[in-house]
Amino acid sequence: MESGGFVMVNNVAVKVSNLSKEFLLGQDKTVSILKDISLSVNYGDFVSILGVSGSGKSTLLSCLSSLSEPTSGEVVINGVNPYTLKEGKLAKFRRQDISIIFQNYNLVPALPVLENVTLPLRLSGKSVDSNKVRKMLDSLNFKAELSSLVSTLSGGEQQKVAITRAIIADSKIIFADEPTGALDSVSRKLIFETLRNLASQGKCVFMVTHDIELASKTDRALILKDGKISRQIIKPSADELYQALETSKG
């Protein structure tokens, strides 16, 4: 089946089975961050991930997006378990199937805006349209020039570059870690609406956020508590999310 120009194995974008993640502390001590999480998310879904600090939100996103292998359990993205791929195929998979918006932007400071945005396209052998890049950045209220070094930009402007890079790649699945965190209220709304539109086009979007108002406009909210999904709320309201988060603090 095809949607939005890309081929889907079926309508399931990401399927997680009994995922747990532990980290080693010292020689003989481990800490459990994620505990027996199972989840299935379809194309066209916009999923927000919320929870108090330390609940495992960013770790879950890293496991879902092929960046951090689970200690146990399975992650399948578009029909593929990325943790079974060899390094070369995994790199290709990340370039072609998914896009990641990092909380710390993950840009190349020595390169200008245009080169940062189009680097994944060049690595994949795809054509580069600088006019399309400029148009996308303009839609996000980006003020700097394409020739500006990203190291000279504010945090908010760097975030817009990182988001444009993820969107311009036209991937099937987008993983976003606090994509609106460094932005003013106007830019925050623009970024969210851009992600919302991607889901409306049939893509799958995951978003870690602390913003209850934005999360209330997603299709599904996952509330994490102590490394587990304590609640899943379909079409969440702000009141439901607030109450769920207050409960998760106990």
Which role fits each region the language model picked out?
Residues S65:
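Helix-to-loop junction immediately C-terminal to a conserved catalytic motif
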Residues G73-N81:
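Conserved ABC transporter NBD signature motif
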Residues N81, D129-E145:
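Conserved ABC ATPase "signature" region
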Residues L111-L119:
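Short coil-to-helix segment of the ABC ATPase nucleotide-binding domain corresponding to the Q-loop/switch region
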Residues L149-L153, E157-Q159:
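Conserved ABC ATPase signature
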Residues D170:
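Conserved catalytic motifs of ABC-family nucleotide-binding domains
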Residues I174-D177:
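Catalytic Walker B motif of ABC-type/P-loop ATPase nucleotide-binding domains
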